[in-house]
Amino acid sequence: MKEYQTVTEISGPLIYAEVDEPIGYDEIVEIETPNGDIKRGQVLESEDGLVAIQVFEGTSGIDTNASVRFSGETLKMKVTEDLLGRVLDGSGQPIDGGPEILADERREIVGAAINPYAREYPEEFIQTGVAAVDGMNTLVRGQKLPIFSGSGLPHNELALQIARQATVPEEENADDNEDDGSEFAVIFGAMGITAEEANEFMEDFERTGALERSVVFMNLADDPAVERTVTPRMVLTTAEYLAFEKDYHVLVILTDMTNYCEALREIGAAREEVPGRRGYPGYMYTDLATLYERAGRIEGREGSVTQIPILTMPGDDDTHPIPDLTGYITEGQIYVDRDLNSQGVQPPVNVLPSLSRLMDDGIGEGLTREDHADVSDQMYAAYAEGEDLRDLVNIVGREALSDRDNKYLDFADRFETEFIDQGFEVNRSINETLEIGWDLLSMLPKDELNRVDEDLIEKYYREENAGETAEIAAE
């Protein structure tokens, strides 16, 4: 490696050095400080003999006497099946005290989006054990389904619940020698989290045994912002290897994408780039797409990469650039709701603004159950009507409502307390979720179930529940 002692400027997480040869974009750099410390960096820009380098460990201790060595290689991730059960820092180095990683291969972390022509359409169900997701906003293999949350809401608890409970149920009609649900892995990437949050994550992974099938990447709040731009790419490179080389169905959970975007803004400001909306880089949409579009399935490969990116909306504003741009790229969203959280509903998922655009392709007979779509549609309609009636009650009082309206109000209350509110430790199968759905729908008269096929009503409707509701209304 050719060595230079030509550092001319230090600006935030960046250093600038003069060179007399062409230097490649994203090339890895070693920086040796005057006291002998070695730091790693990456080339951000190279033009007219001046190179901008982002330093992973921060620029503390670096001055104009530092030595800079260019490797001629881009940043690579050591990948192997033995990564399962390991905990790494945000740049892919082990921090769990375990043995050194013996890689099967080293892969560049700047992967490409899956070729649209080679994509296989996502259509198999992933069971998260969370009724609000499985029953109402179903996740399918190869989908990218973000969770929109707010500051102080329990999105981390929801992420951990999904990480330890998520499975790919075996298809009912699968051949006996096929085990499509056996190879499932979770890659958990945390960016900009506090030490307290990191401890909570690790305690939960170890307590529940979920770590055995997981790879955990931890970038802490006091780690350099530059490392946060690397972490999700390390995560996705590992996921792609396990999915497309080792035939795993991989669920990638990234939290918090807001911290990632703040790191982009910080680096952009240090480079004196022209800012876009609210100071974020104008290329943030493209940058996010390079991450989200790495989810999917490839024809001829058994494995899949499914993404659940989690982001906190500043000021609970879903028009903020981060959730706004994320919504354009991904295939739906799950909303964590502040009002439901204040009522003690766990997890506080508001199903009305939530959406899974690929749900219809991953449910039904042979995937979940024949009545899944009808039950979901009817519960959406009934809950929405109950919500509208709550607004009316605030004006005219409940006494002014008809018996029919009171049944919808009761449905909305029980939908939140019995269907949505299951706690963070309860793992519901899809059958349990749908059975609870029928318990609630049976509060309503049969002629109100206009979104459910008559044959399904005859098969699943509980006459005794309708009778109980009538008695309560009479009292």
Swiss-Prot record:
Pfam family, one: ATP-synt_VA_C
Membrane topology: Peripheral membrane protein
InterPro entries, A to Z: ATP-synt_VA_C (IPR055190), ATPase_a/bsu_AS (IPR020003), ATPase_A1-cplx_bsu (IPR005724), ATPase_F1/V1/A1_a/bsu_N (IPR004100), ATPase_F1/V1/A1_a/bsu_nucl-bd (IPR000194), P-loop_NTPase (IPR027417), V-ATPase_su_B/beta (IPR022879)
Compartments where found: Cell membrane
UniProt superkingdom: Archaea
Molecular function in Gene Ontology: ATP binding; proton-transporting ATP synthase activity, rotational mechanism
One CC-aspect GO term: plasma membrane
Gene Ontology biological-process entries: proton motive force-driven plasma membrane ATP synthesis
Principal cellular location given in the protein's record: membrane
Family: Belongs to the ATPase alpha/beta chains family.
Listed PANTHER family: V-TYPE PROTON ATPASE SUBUNIT B (PTHR43389:SF4)
Functional summary from the UniProt entry: Component of the A-type ATP synthase that produces ATP from ADP in the presence of a proton gradient across the membrane. The B chain is a regulatory subunit.
Binding partners and assembly: Has multiple subunits with at least A(3), B(3), C, D, E, F, H, I and proteolipid K(x).
The name this protein goes by in its record: A-type ATP synthase subunit B
Naturally occurring in which organism (per UniProt): Haloquadratum walsbyi (strain DSM 16790 / HBSQ001)
Lineage per the UniProt record: Archaea, Methanobacteriati, Methanobacteriota, Stenosarchaea group, Halobacteria
